């Protein structure tokens, strides 16, 4: 089999590339996906409110685990990644958050990455998006990904939480992806107008999969990329339960889009990476690149949970006897509780003036429950997810075997810097102050977690060690740049090799301020033009907010927590 391009991974970026490259009817593409189809009648992936279900099994989730995390009481922590058409866009929380403009401007400060500034990238965010309230300077109106805005009156807790943030002295923003990210406001979601998950399989592949020049293989586990000298010339994979490899040749390029955990593994199995690691497994060295699998980053978060004094939370939706009605309303009408991920409000703040742009993110949820659906509080409640955005901690992904079915050694080194601890202490204390604003008085009951007895630095630190969880945002393991630890250049081309690019969240040099999916899709759109040799979209002229030393909040808290 021969194709012009072979794409490994039908995820948030891979599906973008498959769709854009096959717009040229003379270009042939093979898209390999280790998981299965995105079954449209499976409520677990298609119903926004069911977002916890895919994380509880292994049909759609790689269900990786970390090595014992040394600064987290040696816990082995979850590292869920999407498996199936759509990749992690098939199982994520559907929060459409792009990050802060200064994240991308910060990338562009690196020599050679000047074309990755915010205004260079904004046209590609817009190209990917159809926002339900129409386009403007920041948002698209005819892109493949449906974005739904929060509507008034969905749940009184959303507006109360936003208002509490404003009463605490922080800004209000009407669009976390618009002129000003900093502040509290409604959160956009990747949900269709009919209440379905807007994965990249739905948005992109649906328009491309019938093209004769696109071949899609599911249940195709990539073993390795093979080379002719320093040129990538094809891919070998295992189909289904077969132990006999299948191979195909790439006439132009192999495009690695397997994500921040799998992309470095595939490179390492293919002979690209740290020479000592490869020698350990008798893998012939094709090209030494010490940065492969290093620079691993993530967002860590924790929940502050409160009893809700009024019966307005989503607690009744967790009762089995209410779920058939919710399911029917969603299935036949695309409306109701099932049609939202219920992350409809949130915010970004600077915890201290030393940060030039927000370093803390909030997701508000009108129920008290773990992200993966476990440990639901058996009463009306609500919670704040809060976490730091740009931790200096760095980890790694390293193969433990040549077997593609063997999970790698993953270590994030969460909380390995003093800055991490300071940010989480600040975040918990600021959150408590926000929760004690007048806007929440009629709803706020007792603090369920961490609990009012948890006050000192030592107590807060111990709570974080035992209870903080991943936000499922790994990135950085094939970083873009030109230093000795960089893996790809500004166009995703792997240093020292030909015919091979990496296009996914692994190329992010530094993690962004917010959820990763929207930016991963943008990376796919921007790289697609580069691969096709097309001129970049014209640079945007939109204005964007820069704090420039402004106070982190307009006034002191209006009341003390206690």
UniProtKB/Swiss-Prot annotation:
Keywords: FAD, Flavoprotein, NAD, Oxidoreductase. Pathway: Amine and polyamine biosynthesis; betaine biosynthesis via choline pathway; betaine aldehyde from choline (cytochrome c reductase route): step 1/1. GO terms for molecular function: betaine-aldehyde dehydrogenase (NAD+) activity; choline dehydrogenase activity; flavin adenine dinucleotide binding. This is Oxygen-dependent choline dehydrogenase. The active site is at 473 (proton acceptor). GO terms for biological process: glycine betaine biosynthetic process from choline. It comes from Escherichia coli O45:K1 (strain S88 / ExPEC). It catalyses: choline + A = betaine aldehyde + AH2; betaine aldehyde + NAD(+) + H2O = glycine betaine + NADH + 2 H(+). Belongs to the GMC oxidoreductase family. Its EC number is 1.1.99.1, 1.2.1.8. GO terms for cellular component: membrane. PANTHER family: CHOLINE DEHYDROGENASE, MITOCHONDRIAL, GLUCOSE-METHANOL-CHOLINE GMC OXIDOREDUCTASE. The gene is betA. Its cofactor is FAD. FAD binds at residues 4-33. Involved in the biosynthesis of the osmoprotectant glycine betaine. Catalyzes the oxidation of choline to betaine aldehyde and betaine aldehyde to glycine betaine at the same rate.
């Amino acid at each position: 089999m021969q194709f012009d391009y072979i794409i490994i991974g039908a995820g948030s970026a891979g599906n973008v590339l498959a769709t854009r490259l096959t717009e040229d009817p003379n270009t042939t593409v093979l898209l390999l996906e280790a998981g299965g189809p995105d079954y449209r009648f499976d409520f677990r992936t298609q119903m926004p409110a069911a977002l916890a279900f895919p994380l509880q099994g292994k049909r759609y989730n790689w269900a990786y685990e970390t090595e014992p995390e040394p600064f987290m009481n040696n816990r082995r922590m979850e590292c869920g990644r999407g498996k199936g058409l759509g990749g992690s866009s098939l199982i994520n929380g559907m929060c459409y958050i792009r990050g802060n403009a200064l994240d991308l401007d910060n990338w562009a400060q690196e020599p050679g990455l000047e074309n990755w500034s915010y205004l260079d990238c904004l046209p590609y965010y817009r190209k990917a998006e159809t926002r339900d309230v129409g386009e403007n300077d920041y948002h698209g109106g005819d892109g493949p990904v449906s974005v739904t805005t929060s509507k008034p009156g969905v749940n009184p807790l959303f507006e109360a939480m936003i208002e509490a943030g404003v009463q605490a002295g922080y800004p209000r923003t009407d669009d976390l992806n618009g002129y000003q990210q900093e502040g509290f406001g409604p959160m956009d979601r990747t949900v269709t107008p009919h209440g379905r998950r807007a994965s990249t399989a739905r948005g992109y592949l649906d328009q491309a999969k019938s093209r004769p020049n696109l071949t899609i293989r599911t249940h195709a586990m990539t073993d390795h990329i093979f080379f002719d000298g320093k040129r990538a010339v094809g891919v070998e994979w295992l189909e289904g339960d077969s132990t006999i490899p299948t191979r195909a040749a790439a006439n132009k390029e192999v495009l690695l889009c397997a994500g921040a955990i799998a992309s470095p593994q595939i490179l390492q199995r293919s002979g690209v990476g740290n020479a000592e690691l490869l020698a350990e497994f008798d893998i012939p060295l094709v090209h030494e690149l010490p940065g492969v699998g290093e620079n691993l980053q993530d967002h860590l978060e924790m929940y502050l949970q409160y009893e809700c004094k009024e019966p307005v939370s989503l607690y009744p939706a967790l009762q089995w006897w209410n779920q058939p009605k919710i399911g029917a309303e969603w299935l036949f009408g695309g409306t109701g509780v099932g049609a939202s991920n219920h992350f409809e409000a949130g915010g970004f703040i600077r915890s201290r003036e030393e940060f030039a742009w927000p370093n803390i993110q909030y997701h508000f949820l009108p129920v008290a429950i773990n992200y993966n659906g476990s440990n639901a509080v058996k009463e009306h409640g609500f919670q704040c997810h809060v976490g730091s955005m740009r931790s200096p901690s760095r980890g790694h992904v390293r193969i433990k075997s040549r077997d593609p079915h063997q999970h790698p050694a993953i270590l994030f080194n969460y909380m390995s810097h003093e800055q991490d601890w300071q940010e989480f202490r600040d975040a918990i204390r600021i959150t408590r102050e926000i929760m004690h604003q007048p806007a929440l008085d009629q709803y706020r009951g007792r603090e369920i977690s961490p609990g009012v007895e948890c006050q000192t630095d030592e107590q807060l630190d111990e709570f974080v060690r035992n209870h903080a969880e991943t936000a499922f945002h790994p990135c950085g393991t094939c970083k873009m740049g030109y230093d000795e630890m960089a893996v790809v250049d500004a166009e995703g081309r792997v240093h020292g090799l030909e015919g091979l690019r990496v296009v996914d969240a692994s190329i992010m040099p530094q993690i962004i301020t917010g959820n990763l999916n929207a930016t991963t899709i943008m990376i796919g759109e921007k790289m697609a033009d580069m691969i096709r040799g097309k001129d970049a979209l014209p640079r945007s002229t939109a204005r964007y907010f820069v704090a420039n030393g402004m106070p982190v909040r307009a006034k002191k808290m209006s009341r003390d927590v206690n």
